[in-house]
From Swiss-Prot:
Its job: Inhibits the expression or activity of extracellular murein hydrolases by interacting, possibly with LrgA, with the holin-like proteins CidA and/or CidB. The LrgAB and CidAB proteins may affect the proton motive force of the membrane. May be involved in programmed cell death (PCD), possibly triggering PCD in response to antibiotics and environmental stresses.
Key words, A-Z: Cell membrane, Cytolysis, Membrane, Transmembrane, Transmembrane helix
Membrane-traversing stretches: 7-27, 33-53, 63-83, 97-117, 124-144, 152-172, 212-232
Range of residues in the leader sequence: none
A UniProt-annotated Pfam family: LrgB
UniProt source species: Staphylococcus saprophyticus subsp. saprophyticus (strain ATCC 15305 / DSM 20229 / NCIMB 8711 / NCTC 7292 / S-41)
Membrane topology recorded in Swiss-Prot or TrEMBL: Multi-pass membrane protein
Record family assignment: Belongs to the CidB/LrgB family. LrgB subfamily.
Single GO biological process annotation from the record: programmed cell death
UniProt-listed NCBIfam families: PRK04288.1
Compartments where found: Cell membrane
Database matches in HAMAP family: LrgB (MF_01142)
Protein name from the UniProt record: Antiholin-like protein LrgB
A GO-annotated cellular component: plasma membrane
């Protein structure tokens, strides 16, 4: 019967992505944010499992998946809206914001390298992991330029975002971080676009700070990751 499904049309990839995502979103809200029901994580697992169990080639999924991927960059640009609304905060605290994000992102890149070295990962794997702090649209080209594996980088970016989306807000509440600027910067710097989505649940200030973090982290990754790769790999 599977041969008769419309697997060669864009609808197959789109539905395989959206149906698990919608169901997971419902379950995520019903369970008060249980991390295993994080929509992106569930969609990824269900999609991979379905393709493996049915024997359908990834190329069939990619026809529709590419359409969804097309909207990735325009969706990222939309994060500029809360940033514009709270531009007064950005003007007032721009030194602290820029300094905190720069130090945090650079430290994260160095830590990724040190951990990877400790586990004796190959240079290709290390290069694949270095750009994971940026969005997919930025991380993949950087990974390719420094000798990384784009598929591995994509997985690292997704897992990084899923972890922050699932646990970031809980950690902020656990450590009683009440400053909206600090909350937004923490989520945006560590979790890129999914961190921004998580920050939006707190408020407009958090969302705007997370948005500027996403942009600055991307710029830092583009500059620092190739330098680290040249010096250390």
């Amino acid at each position: 019967m599977i041969e008769h499904l419309a697997i060669n049309t864009p609808y197959f990839g789109i539905l395989l992505s959206l149906i698990p995502f919608i169901i997971a979103t419902f379950l995520f809200k019903k369970t008060n944010g249980f991390f295993l029901f994080t929509p992106l994580f569930v969609s990824m697992v269900v999609g991979i499992a379905f393709l493996k169990l049915t024997g359908i080639d990834y190329a069939n999924y990619k026809i529709g998946g590419d359409i969804i991927n097309f909207f990735l960059e325009p969706a990222t640009i939309c994060f500029a809206i809360p940033l514009y609304k709270r531009r007064d905060v950005l003007k007032k605290y721009w030194k602290q914001i820029l300094g905190g994000i720069t130090l945090g992102t650079t430290a994260a890149l160095v830590c990724i390298y040190l951990i990877a070295e400790a586990f004796q990962f190959s240079n290709g794997i290390i290069a694949s992991m270095l750009p994971q702090g940026a969005t997919t649209a930025i991380a993949l080209p950087v990974s390719a330029d420094i000798g990384g594996i784009k598929e591995l980088t994509s997985l690292a970016v997704i897992l990084n975002g899923v972890i922050i989306y699932a646990l970031g807000s809980k950690l902020i509440k656990l450590f009683n971080i009440t400053n909206p600027i600090a909350r937004g910067l923490a989520l945006g710097t560590s979790g890129h676009s999914l961190g921004v989505s998580s920050a939006q649940e707190f408020g407009e200030t958090e969302a705007s700070m997370a948005s500027i973090s996403l942009v600055i982290v991307g710029v830092i990754v583009v500059i620092v990751a190739p330098i680290l790769a040249t010096l250390l790999l």
